[in-house]
């Protein structure tokens, strides 16, 4: 069983139960199918918007839910027990627009975009990575050149989550000759503008369905000056703040995948008989399942400690903690899902059983929001400062 963190409020627990029911009713029945078909489930995404999950970070004053990081992670975890891709759609518009506007937007930008986001029907993507700028994101080559009152954006972005279905995309581009991160700015770009081209949908190992990926190409895309979020050269700092917020959210998705895999492994071990008894009675498998549970609970404990600190405004050391929790949770997800496949044996390798999908999905949690090697570097840098 999964243990609910002791510091959850009554409101947190009620919300958790609501999302659990929603996930069992709406997500579980389609989770395998949207992976196999790589189909974007518009009908369920619309219900996410109705629940306020997509527009999670939009302030209440603009019609949004203004949800806490803790509740976002609760939603992510419960949804990921069945589907990682649908889990990530909770708070999907955060990185792409809501969080950048909260961190650095003008009042005019907030008034323009937040009411639209609050309806839960607009999808926004986050375009940072480039062919030559992955972990070294500050080396990006996409450029924005001033042309009167406008900017002209040219360049190429890769691995843009929700790119094929996005109405807007937050584009990070070099706007001046300052070295590396100091020369990067952020722009809100309407994907229907002339000069914006999407590449074909990427074919991925996992993480299929609700989170399609594609590349973007920008050819002298003209945007007004007020499309820039923050000041000239402040874009990289905005990107890093978004990623620090989202690392616990991705961690929650990882914990959810792991819990879902453990639940399936335990149920299978109780039911599957070999040598005249359920395989759950063999000590070797009992030890495996015990280790899986311990990894999940330790990851969950750190996760909600980190979210509680963020929600309380206790930001001292938060950057290192967000790196720690992302690494711990995603490594646990990879190990637990792999062990779940092993417990199911040949059945675990079959697509009719969900654990092989969960193992494929778990891998991306070690890569997104910064690879786990980068996270370890950030933790070490904090220790040695």
Q: Could you tell me what each predicted segment is?
A:
Residues 92-98:
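Short, conserved phosphate-binding/catalytic loop or strand-edge motifs used
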Residues 117, 132-135, 159-162, 175-178, ...:
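Short Gly/Pro-enriched turn/cap motifs at secondary-structure boundaries
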Residues 120-128:
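A short, Trp-centered hydrophobic/proline-enriched beta-strand micro-motif
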Residues 125, 139-143, 150, 168-172, ...:
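Conserved hydrophobic/aromatic beta-strand scaffold that supports enzyme active sites
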Residues 154-199:
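A short core secondary-structure module
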